[in-house]
């Protein structure tokens, strides 16, 4: 009888440990979904948010935040340079089009297709659509996240082949280089 209780106790312990791992994975998946939704809700429709508010540490990785800050600073500096120039009617270097999406026009809708978590990184495949033109445009971008000591942060976005850049960091770096 004691062996039966011992076996039952060990079995219940192992089952409860496995259940916690599944719940932990589910909660990580939920946190990542929320982070990606926050990203596209705040920055997906317009580049105005980039210029009008500080880049949050809670959303972007330190590496991506640094590149974003450099690009914003370069753009604002060029805006001021043009204003003070002999030709203030010239167009300064500003972010044009949807910088966080493959399609210049941006998107009218998106859906998270999959989340792949491996150690401290995650890849989120996003299906986008732009239905304000005929035919409707569809494409897939991949959001890359890293799990920092402060939680999941967006580290890069790999663009679909319809985009004019390989990824977000490359696009921002090219932008900064064009201001020099």
What are these regions (language model features)?
Residues 13-16:
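C-terminal motif of bacterial Sec signal peptides marking the signal peptidase cleavage site
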Residues 18-20:
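Bacterial signal peptide processing site
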Residues 61, 67-134:
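Surface-exposed, charged secondary-structure patches
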Residues 112-114, 141-147:
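Hydrophobic/aromatic beta-strand elements that line small-molecule binding cavities or substrate pockets
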């Amino acid at each position: 009888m004691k062996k039966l209780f011992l076996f039952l106790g060990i079995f219940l312990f192992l089952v409860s440990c496995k259940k916690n791992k599944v719940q932990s994975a589910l909660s990580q998946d939920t946190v990542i979904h929320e982070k990606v939704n926050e990203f596209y809700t705040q920055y997906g429709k317009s580049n105005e948010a980039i210029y009008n508010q500080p880049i949050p540490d809670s959303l972007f990785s330190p590496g991506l935040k640094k590149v974003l800050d450099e690009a914003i600073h370069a753009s604002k500096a060029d805006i001021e340079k043009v204003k003070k120039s002999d030709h203030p009617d010239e167009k300064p270097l500003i972010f044009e089009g949807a910088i966080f999406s493959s399609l210049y026009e941006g998107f009218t809708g998106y859906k998270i297709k999959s989340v792949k978590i491996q150690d401290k990184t995650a890849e989120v495949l996003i299906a986008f659509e732009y239905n304000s033109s005929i035919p409707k445009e569809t494409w897939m971008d991949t959001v890359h996240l890293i799990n920092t000591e402060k939680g999941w942060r967006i580290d890069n976005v790999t663009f679909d082949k319809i985009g004019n850049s390989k990824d977000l960091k490359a696009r921002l770096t090219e932008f900064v280089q064009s201001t020099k």
